[in-house]
Structure formats: structure tokens, C-alpha cells
């Protein structure tokens, strides 16, 4: 992957998770204010809020599902093949306590930073490029879903 495209992918991933590079000065696709990425949206959310069911799923489940998908991406980048994954199980979280909620968020942060580092280190091919781009699209989709769920949770 050429350097320009690699840098663009990293920019989009950062915006998805960390929000716009310069809050208030525009963005590529999130809201332009700070904390509009996944980490900012989740910041300050209590474990009770993360456990509230919205149409049969929770913010904790969405957050861990993003982590799980990104873990799979990181495994593919490391080993060159898809790990065995149980997608149904990735939605099994119905309630969390404070410690579990912190662990889920920390796990997501770790997978995110692992992916960012890997983007500069891997030997690119079509499979790996598609996997990284799918992780970006998947995470952006769930950012939107989480933002919609928050309208119910924070009422």
C-alpha cells in the first residue's frame, strides 16, 4: 500500500476512534466537536448505562463486538489467516459491572492501538488491505449505532 493511502487509512481510523484531528475545525465524517469518536462517545458512560438494553442489545455488547472484530483483524494481520470466530458470542454481553466495563473499553483501546501500529509494519496485499478497510467501515458503522443508542440511554 502506498504511503499516501496508508496515512489516509490511519487518519480515518483515528477519527473513528479519537474524533477529528482538530476539534471544531471540521472532520472527514464524524461531528467536528471533540469526543465525537468512539472513545469520546463512551467516555464518562457508566456501567449502568452500558448495560441498558436498547432493542435487545447493550452499549457494552456493541463496544465489545467492535473489539472482537478488531482482534480478528489484528490476528489476520499477524498470521495471514482468519482466526476461528464466534460472531453470535460476540453479542452475549447483557450487563456489566464497573470492572468489566473498564476492561471492555481497555481491550478496545489495546486492539485499536495494535491495529494502528500494524498498519505501518505489515507487508500489504489485497487480503490485508480489505481486512483493514473492513475494520474501519465496521467500526464507523458501530460508532453510528452507539450514537443512536445514546439517545435512549442518556434520556
Residue ranges and their predicted role:
Residues 2-35, 39-42, 47-89, 124-155:
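Short, contiguous alpha-helical
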Residues 91-133, 139-140:
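Acidic/histidine-rich alpha-helical segments that form the ligand environment
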Amino acid at each position: 500500500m502506498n504511503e499516501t493511502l496508508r496515512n489516509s487509512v490511519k487518519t480515518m481510523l483515528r477519527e473513528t476512534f479519537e474524533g477529528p484531528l482538530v476539534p471544531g475545525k471540521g472532520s472527514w465524517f464524524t461531528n467536528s466537536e471533540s469526543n465525537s469518536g468512539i472513545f469520546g462517545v463512551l467516555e464518562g458512560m457508566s456501567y449502568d448505562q452500558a448495560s441498558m438494553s436498547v432493542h435487545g442489545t447493550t452499549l457494552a455488547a456493541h463496544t465489545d463486538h467492535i473489539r472482537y472484530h478488531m482482534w480478528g483483524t489484528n490476528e489476520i494481520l499477524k498470521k495471514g489467516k482468519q482466526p476461528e470466530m464466534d460472531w453470535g458470542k460476540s453479542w452475549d454481553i447483557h450487563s456489566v459491572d464497573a470492572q468489566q466495563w473498564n476492561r471492555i473499553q481497555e481491550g478496545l483501546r489495546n486492539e485499536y492501538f495494535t491495529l494502528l501500529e500494524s498498519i505501518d509494519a505489515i507487508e500489504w496485499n489485497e487480503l490485508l488491505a480489505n481486512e483493514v478497510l473492513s475494520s474501519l467501515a465496521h467500526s464507523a458503522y458501530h460508532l453510528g449505532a452507539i450514537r443512536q443508542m445514546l439517545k435512549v440511554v442518556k434520556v
